[in-house]
Amino acid sequence: CAGTWHSDQPHEGFHDCQHRSAEHRDFCYRQRPRVIFSRIIPVGGKQFNESICNLNRRKNNFQIGSKTAKRVKIALADLGTDKKEARKVRGVDGASGLPMEGIITSSLVNEALLSGVNEIGEEIKHALERTPPQIHDHIQKEGIYITGGSTRIPNIDRYLSRQLGCPVQLSQYYDLCTICGLKELITHDALHRWAYTVNKKK
């Protein structure tokens, strides 16, 4: 979350940051340069991809890999419109175990994503319910910023905004937050004590 400070974002507010190899999200409230509140949400891009793989296997009886799931997630998902598209992909037949081609639709991808997106929304709502009134008022005005690769899912900001009842905005620097966070740790006095050099193993 420390890496989300950029010119396009306020110096304080709630941020939903995907990290840890896309396995988790870190939902935090920050006042530069400090992170005041942080909560781990065990949902990230990896879980979204696995959900697409699992639902496709159950409904279409053929298996696809996580890389294919990631591609169709970006190509077919849309949480704001009733998108009607499909892609032909290669996978493995669930009965014979042989390579095959199959069709994955946008409706299947959206269905697979919604449970994870809803879980993120519910966790954020629970956190907002426990925030002091002055912070809650600030969030209602400034909104929440989302970063990480899942920000590329079309209309995820609008979907979460309807669920949360506050503005949700996408960071323009979703793919650089880890690097920028390391920069914050190194260059800011309040965070510098958390930085250390990793010793090489002998």
Model-derived segments and spans:
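Residue-level signature of catalytic and energy-coupling elements of molecular machines
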Residues: Q18, I52, I124, I146, ...
